[in-house]
Design a protein with these regions (language model features):
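Active-site-proximal, substrate-binding regions of enzyme catalytic domains
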Residues: 2-210, 217-259
Length: 259
């Protein structure tokens, strides 16, 4: 039965690890953009992993395009999050300071809060400078471009894209993954489908095990039961096996930290 219905069987973690030296890792744009959400020490580890597996990494052209379009969007969003956190923390401090002379608040607790405030203010300031530096100088963007040079897949022609979008209308109407969860989007409605078609084309041309690394856990990528992600959407695997005849375990970005 397994041979006839491979789409319903999941690859174990041990089997996945055994394939690391012979597979191709295909990165989604969201994973690349997560680099701009990480602390600097984590970014260095991420770059080390990418450099180690550089020859095995590919990025769909459409995913790379979306990555570039959204770098500044992500950085500005992170800066706004810091500002909002600062405001919330300052409001808390102001409320506490108005009551710190009450007898039930010990001097020790008050001193600890002062130390905490100083450290958090320092963290906010350092992270703000770090993100602003990325926004202006683009250091991580340049480093990633260097690491992934030659790793981006070939783009579809405008004619091919029109055909994919035409297929997308039918697929989305029938909830055929991936991408139908984005059917209501005004922009990049067929982005997931275009990425998927790039992956299928690459898999058909290359005799490699494919590991697609993404943090997209919508139901048009991931099978869910009782609120838990239990594996890849079987329809995706069925389509992949039909085109390729090989396993493609789709994992979120935690697969990177398991390398």
């Amino acid at each position: 039965m397994r041979k006839q219905f491979p789409q319903y069987y999941r690859v174990s973690q041990s089997d996945l690890l055994k394939r690391f030296d012979e597979c191709v890792f295909i990165f989604d744009s969201c994973v690349l953009l997560d680099i701009f959400r990480m602390k600097e020490e984590l970014v260095d580890k991420m770059f080390n992993v990418i450099e180690h597996y550089k020859d095995q990494i590919r990025v769909p052209y459409h995913a790379a395009s979306e990555y570039y379009k959204n770098i500044n969007v992500v950085l500005k969003f992170q800066l706004n999050k810091i500002r909002e956190s600062q405001k919330s923390f300052e409001a808390f401090i102001k409320t506490f300071q108005a009551q710190r002379n009450y007898p039930y608040i010990s001097p020790e607790a008050s001193d600890l809060l002062d130390k905490l405030k100083n450290q958090i203010d320092k963290d906010f300031s350092e992270q703000t400078l770090y993100l602003e530096k990325q926004l202006v100088q683009g250091l991580h963007q340049n480093k990633l471009a260097q690491l992934l040079d030659g790793c981006v897949l070939e783009a579809f022609s405008s004619t091919e894209l029109m055909e994919i979008e035409k297929q997308g209308e039918t697929r989305y109407a029938n909830h055929i993954p991936p991408g139908w969860k984005d059917a209501s989007k005004d922009e990049n409605r067929y982005g997931d489908l275009i990425n998927w078609m790039e992956i299928l084309r690459y898999a058909k041309q290359n005799a490699k095990t494919i590991i697609f690394i993404s943090n997209d856990v919508k139901e048009d990528w991931v099978q869910k039961e009782m609120g838990k992600n239990i594996g890849v959407q079987p329809l995706l695997l069925e389509e992949f096996y039909e085109k390729k005849g090989n396993h493609t375990p789709i994992r979120d970005k935690i697969a990177i930290s398991c390398i």
